[in-house]
A protein has these predicted regions:
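HotDog/MaoC-like acyl-thioester-processing domains
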Residues: 9, 76-77, 86-106
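Intrinsic-disorder/low-complexity, polar/charged segments enriched in Ser/Thr/Lys/Arg/Asp/Glu/Gln
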Residues: 7-13, 39, 66, 80-82, ...
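Hydrophobic beta-strand-centered segment that forms part of the acyl-chain substrate-binding groove
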Residues: 48-82
């Protein structure tokens, strides 16, 4: 990976058009027809990976080891949701991201 001072502040984005299969009711999580928490997490992880693409050396990759998720709204099938991720801390090989997910324009 490139030096920490180059990677700190890197930003990535990811977009998903919510399908019926992405909802809590379809995944058996609850009876609500809204985006399942695991889908939000996957979208954020995708944005984190996108943030690092130009900073990783050939053969390097990254994966999620810890997360904290607070959901303050919901989206239903047919809605397009977007995730932003920004590298806010680097401690050795551990990177910390700040992420948010929203629908519509910001």
């Amino acid at each position: 990976m490139k030096p920490a001072e180059e990677v700190l502040g890197a930003v990535g984005f990811s977009v998903l058009s919510v399908r019926p299969g992405d909802t809590c009711v379809t995944m058996g999580v609850s009876d609500l027809p809204v985006v399942a928490p695991s889908i939000y997490l996957s979208l954020m992880e995708s944005a984190c990976v996108a943030a690092l693409m130009e900073y990783l050396d050939s053969g390097e990759t990254t994966f999620l080891t810890h997360s904290s998720l607070e959901i303050v709204g919901s989206a239903a099938a047919g809605v397009e949701i977007r995730a932003n991720a920004r590298v806010i801390n680097i401690d050795g090989r551990e990177l910390t991201f700040e992420c948010d997910v929203y629908d519509g324009e910001r």
